[in-house]
Amino acid sequence: MFCTRGLLFFAFLAGLDIEFTGLRSNLSGPQQISLFDLPSEWYLKTRQSVQQFTVCQIGLSVFSAIEGEANKYIAHSCNFYLFPTTFGILDSEFSFQASSVQFLNQYGFNYNKFLKNGIPYMNEEQEKKIRHDILTGNWRVRSSPDKDQIKVVIDEVTRWLELAKEGDWMTLPGITGFQAFEVQLVLRQALPNIWTVLKDEGVVVKKVSKQHRWYLQNTSCDRESCWKENILLSARGFSVFFQMLVKAQKPLVGHNMMMDLLHLHEKFFRPLPESYDQFKQNIHSLFPVLIDTKSVTKDIWKEMNFPRVSNLSEVYEVLNSDLNPTKNSGPEIVHASRCEKYVETKCPHEAAYDAFLCGSVLLKVAHLLLQKIYHIDPVPESSFPQYLDVLAPYVNQVNLIRAGVPKINFSGPDYPSIRPPILILSVKRWPGVSEQQVYHKFQNLCKFDVRRLTRSQFLLLTNKFKDARNILKEYRDHPTLCISLYRYWRHSPNVNCLLQVCGIVTAWALLAFILGRSGT
């Protein structure tokens, strides 16, 4: 792999981006994510989508300092096409979402590399099952295409054995990679008088005596136990690199990276737990320093009055333009040799390119923040530790799309909501009105999430204060649609019911008291 353990060890940060076969299940009603959701509710809804779709490409860009050159960084960027391990009992099911396929196809995603040459991967639970089956000899070929190919191979080798002498060998060409381990495992289990070796040209099968076979199994460098460990290592595939990334404990940088973190946990660590707090603890243990460039750029964009941007590429363009006052004094970033594809070529939504943008944006924004502290440009002796210091308020604050809070805090309790207040809509002379009808009624003016409160009342919530003010003003004197600020103690049906019960109890108590006194 391009990214050795040593390269990760000496790196300052790792940019990450992941592409998926789908983003969200088309859930309806209460299962849809909304601005009303608490982080724990948002997590449980999104967890279903993460379990349904899979990762098709991971991009990593590892940034290291260039020795002897101040504030200069070199980026090693690489794409990994992934495909779930199909080995023994493992045969994952996953879905494609048409819009996601269309989107990636629009940007030139190579589905052949994903489906034909994807690197296998598994999480820790899957690895335990496979390890047990391989080491105990309970392993079986499960998929029909593999069974058919294995049958052809066994028939071919069996016919050859009938005429072969001890010491003779034959080659099975075109069998490479992980499949070669599978073929060898089956042949060794099925035929006691052969030995197999993997070479560049394919799997080499040699006829041997049973005594020689025993000797090879127990004394050679390719003895059974070591060989089975190699099979397991091959089956783990990208998961080996994931563990290297975890052990390196470097700052992990992404853009709107919440979905990336969910998939990293589910696909490479463990199945997502039902507990939202447990998920947060697990991620913080794996990656103690997370930085979401979406959270960082949100604040700096308002402060610097930069033009509005809608994606990571546009953020990068603004920071590389003359609009950035530190454009010429900021960190210099170069691409490593053999990683120079992106020097002249822009490849938006290619995972490694977006990972490179994440790391670059972070360094440039950090320099901008540092300059604002010193009030001079260039900043004297700017360094990555200084960058981390100014980024401290953003560490482990991951942006959250469409939820009751704007971000998740992975190193502690989540912050309270800073969304606009909830509004309450009271409807008159509109029998049978639905949430969908209410949504369409206001969508041209502003976008609200709608939740029914009673038969004729609905809660409205937006993520823009301006929209809340506008609709309150627009519908101030409307004859059939009355909109006001929602007050829990005033509008909640539960509170109203409780107050009514209390009123009845109080009235009965008062009546009993009066009747009791009159009886005496």
From Swiss-Prot:
Keyword Signal on this protein? no
Q: Binding residues for Mg(2+), per the UniProt record?
A: 17, 19, 260, 354
Q: What is the top EC class of this enzyme, as a single word?
A: hydrolase
The feature of type site (Interaction with poly(A)) is located at 294
Q: Which residues cross the membrane?
A: 495-515
Q: Show the catalytic activity.
A: Exonucleolytic cleavage of poly(A) to 5'-AMP
* Record's protein name: Poly(A)-specific ribonuclease PNLDC1
Supply the source organism for this entry.
Homo sapiens (Human)
Gene symbol of the encoding locus: PNLDC1
